[in-house]
Amino acid sequence: MAKEQELNLQGGCQQQAAQPQAPAVVASQATEQAVIQIKNGLPEQLRPLQQCFIKPLETAKKMGIPNERYVQECNFAMQAMLKNTYLIGCAKKYPDEFVSALNNVLLTGMTLNPTLNVAYLVPYKGVVQMQTSYMGKKSYAINTGLCKDIDCSLVFKGEEFAISKGTNPSIKHIPNPWASHTADTLLGGYYVITYSSGKIAFDTMSKEEIEAIKKRSPSVGSGKQSPWDTDYFEMCKKTLINRAYKQLPKIGMSPEAQKALEIINGLDEQVAKDNNYGQNEQDDVFVDVTEV
């Protein structure tokens, strides 16, 4: 009898024990929590864009990206837009494109973290777009296995520099850290790619070539301050890495990686195309793109 009561007691405890929630329920609750966090974090100026910030949660879910990471990216985006209120107007006018820009951050594995400076939200032709920096492109190429290493360097007056081509090509650069490093003393730059096979490729660009691309930049053409004024050497390096990207192997890439690469190169390629046809919008003076 006592044994029967003990069994009944155990059975009752099992019935009362909480059943684990299904994964779908847990995921739904996590998404709801992320939505609440996004809504609560929106400043007054960005509340009309609430749904734009929420929609990319679906992309995060499909890619297996934690909601916490996307909420963090939303916070970075909000900071950028409050700092540059022109972006807010562009996002309100073209909300779908703004959603695409946020999605592109996730699809490429980039971050809008301002301390890392790998990707930004920029206006181009009145539309908010994601753009990668020199460091962003460098990190992507290495992290995705497009190459083992990729780097760009600038050469200044007073430094030893020589290249040799033929059957055994090589490049020699002895920097002078105490030389004058200014736009006036810049001679040019070069990139070096180390492929997965160990093979090395390199090429150079003169200052004149870099300056020719700078002059075609829409931000420079506006006559107002541009990244070429505030971050000249960074822009020179981005010009070089855009050229280097043409030499990266694309065969064997997964469809997802190909899509991400298209996104990363997309804005730079569009601006280069528009530069050639004179179709730049002069109102968008914050774009820091260079020709590929």
Predicted feature locations:
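Glycine- and charge-rich intrinsically disordered segments
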Residues: 1-59, 64, 255-292
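Binding-interface segments
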Residues: 35-252
